[in-house]
Amino acid sequence: MKEPSIVVKGARAHNLKNVDIELPKNQLIVMTGLSGSGKSSLAFDTIYAEGQRRYVESLSAYARQFLGQMDKPDVDTIEGLSPAISIDQKTTSKNPRSTVATVTEIYDYIRLLYARIGKPFCPNHGIEIESQTVQQMVDRIMELEERTKIQLLAPVVNHRKGTHEKLLTDISKKGYVRVRVDGEIMDVTQVPELDKNKNHTIEIVVDRLVVKPGIETRLADSIETVLELADGRLVVDIIDGDKLEFSEKHACPICGFSVGELEPRMFSFNSPFGACPTCDGLGQKLTVDLDLVVPDKDKTLNEGAILPWEPTSSDFYPSMLKRVCEVYKINMDKPFKKLTERQRNIILYGSGDKEIEFTFKSKFGQERKRTMPFEGVVPNIERRYHESPSEYVREMMQKYMGEQVCETCHGQRLSREALSVYVAGKNIGEVVEQSIKEALIYYENIELSEQDAQIAHLILKEITSRLAFLNNVGLDYLTLNRSSGTLSGGEAQRIRLATQIGSRLSGVLYVLDEPSIGLHQRDNDRLIHTLQEMRDLGNTLIVVEHDEDTMIAADYLVDIGPGAGEHGGEVVASGTPKQVMRNSKSLTGQYLSGKKFIPVPEHRRPVTDRKISVKGARSNNLKNVDVDFPLSVMNVVTGVSGSGKSSLVNEVLYKSLAKAINKSKVKPNEHDEMTGMDQIDKIIDIDQSPIGRTPRSNPATYTGVFDDIRDVFASTNEAKVRGYQKGRFSFNVKGGRCEACKGDGIIKIEMHFLPDVYVPCEVCHGKRYNRETLEVTYKGKNIADVLEMTVEDATQFFENIPKIKRKLQTLVDVGLGYITLGQPATTLSGGEAQRVKLASELHKRATGRSIYILDEPTTGLHVDDISRLLKVLNRLVENGDTVVIIEHNLDVIKTADNLIDLGPEGGDGGGTILATGTPEEIAAIPESYTGRYLKTVLARDKERMEG
């Protein structure tokens, strides 16, 4: 009997060339190939899109309008499809209320656990809050030694100021004779006048008893009377002994602190029943940051030390500041840091109740006087942020504000009541502060009473299984309360992967996009095991991946190529990894078999005294780290996931340099000092964010080559005759563009039950320009034809114009010869966007004083692409510039001049510098996980080179 399979015929999405392929079901299938070869087009835009579309088609029209239907992919037929689930990196929630625990649903089970077996404790007195019946109170009192003398007290005033005259009169009228005031028993009519400014405690003596058999009925009656008088509270005073306190409500018998009925919503920071009232469950509050208000404390007030009140278009605030300085005799030509504390406080926080006469000038020169207190810079920013109806003003004010931990809940997001409930000695806030690894150990070894263990059995099973899945995909270092908006694409994807395993579905087609991103080699085996576990449940996995270990572990490997863009789109090889390795046409096969490889450089650039030094970095989990970044070499920062690489490079190094050199309004994370910045005059962060947020942005506009191309068209004879300037050839402004589609080339048609349809503009037929503009040609091509050219073709077309050729050649050098000049920025992958940014830097004149920061630049890159990327990065370093890369890829690590290895573990177990030096030096350090893998790779490559 034939094995079940997915049969694709005639796939033509994007650059696919009528691809026919048969993929075995219930297998781990890895698709690989050069960046831009068509892997994602086949996996996501064809197979997943059709699987999802067919599932959605089966739903009612009413349900479809909420789901948003997918377009039918350009393919003849696909047979054998299952319902498809895509796990990619793009759908991370940026909602600050979303955390690792909520996304994985672990938090729902933890809330349920606390609602079912949690024990509330009074935060003021540390005693357990229990609701007790009268019968339970009687039983507890009767356990006292026989002949014990007791008195039952009703606490009616608990530590409150006042004379309480009326209350004492009412007590007397009710027939009670004795009261205990501030610990002293006295006749109710003999109570002296109480000091209204002091706190007092008043308890009514309801009954006096001697513990002995037979008093139960009288005791119960008296207790009921006390509970009625004291709002459910009872104090039993043992003569010559201690006291017992009881409450019939969930309230502290001493202070009355009460906790309502325990239910799951009480532990949700997204519900008004559980959220901290001060920060509304966010754990942080937006407050004015003085370092952003006065970034340069060496400046004087006249030089604009107060950044929000710099003299710009309006003189309103600067004139107000000048008047305040006159009144308080503050020298405006003195550096801000040299003003007295009182003077600084007046400027920042205002004059209090003291009124000052201000003179304001209108724009017509009219003067008006007004007497009022001076508000102060900080209250002014807060008021304008909270009260202004203008979004622009709010955005401007937010630039001077930063997130501060909420003082009420200390960042734990929950109300005082929710945080006073404990299970096995921890409240819910303390539990979610643990890393996944710590939480797993905690819940696997939790000690509960027999009854609680019985209640919690199933809940704990759900919690531990989910934590184990997260642990197994290499996320053990993440804390449960980590905001999902701060996760990298790879981390977010692995979280969703763990959530899917938790659902234990079978018969599903999963399509994954590079799940190994951001994962150290050490954790790769666990990820591969997880993927195999999903397969063993009876699922088909299609994984777009470049990682060598994952490819070798695949049941079926598909190599798409042979090149990228129009040179790709074909299945070069498919079969088991060994079959692909034997295929001479497969570039992937040649790299896997070792016939091709990235060589280790023969000589590494020497590290000189020129360096940037960071001292005492304490960002996130960094433990007071001192580290040097040598200049004019390639630095690679390594370490297991969560060891502190991004904290060191992005939060300390980059932000400090950006603030000092670019004058950016960013706040570097905590560190003591940074030296050597004077040797740098340019800092460039080449990340994978889009090069533009609209289809109007494209590689030609981003690199600046489109300006030069428009100059060429404007200099043609036809353009000169018609009087066309450079602006005529822009599709963003009126004049040359097609006004029917405003230069978009497409028209959007809204469909209610179907997805919005984009159709080519009927007037310009997708060309973006009007007829007159398109009549101007250069070498037989108009401006629209040029935008449709690939970078490779355009390089040849403009080979006689060095300025244009140089810029286009850099795009070819970074491996982007296949993209078109006018390709919308929104359709570029993260790796492609990053390389466009690199290319635009390459054609600029090198100064030898630039520093380039790249965070995992190998994302989305095939080994052959990485080889090309390394050549480009080495070109930057050869020009004297400095490169700092965060990377897990061993091909990049082994070619570095200087390695900085963090660890040894992730999260709290990391944050220290294990070693710095050449790859050979790191490979010799047994404590370094990176070193262990590096040792193997260096030895293997040495053999290959000798062989």
Each PLM stretch: what is its role?
Residues 1-947:
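Conserved phosphate-binding elements of NTP-dependent enzyme cores
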